[in-house]
């Protein structure tokens, strides 16, 4: 491995080979209602 990037590889990279994926949030932020409920519960 060399420190310099191989620009030929980057230039010849075919974006159409990439699969389109659906992003799914693993850790969605809690809503304000959820936060209030947790504050009142403790």
From Swiss-Prot:
InterPro entries: Beta-thymosin, Beta-thymosin_sf. The modification N-acetylserine is found at residue 2. Keywords: Acetylation, Actin-binding, Cytoplasm, Cytoskeleton. Residues 1-25, 33-42 have a biased composition (Basic and acidic residues). One of its GO terms (molecular function) is actin monomer binding. It comes from the Eukaryota. One of its GO terms (cellular component) is cytoplasm. One of its GO terms (biological process) is actin filament organization. Residues 1-42 are annotated as: Disordered. Disulfide bonds: none annotated. It is found in: Cytoplasm, Cytoskeleton. Its main location: cytoplasm. Belongs to the thymosin beta family. PANTHER family: THYMOSIN BETA, THYMOSIN BETA-4-LIKE. Plays an important role in the organization of the cytoskeleton. Binds to and sequesters actin monomers (G actin) and therefore inhibits actin polymerization. This is Thymosin beta-11.
């Amino acid at each position: 491995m060399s420190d310099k990037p191989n620009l030929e590889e980057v230039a010849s990279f075919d974006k159409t080979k990439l699969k389109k994926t659906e992003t799914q949030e693993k850790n969605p932020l809690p809503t304000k209602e959820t936060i209030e409920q947790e504050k009142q519960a403790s």
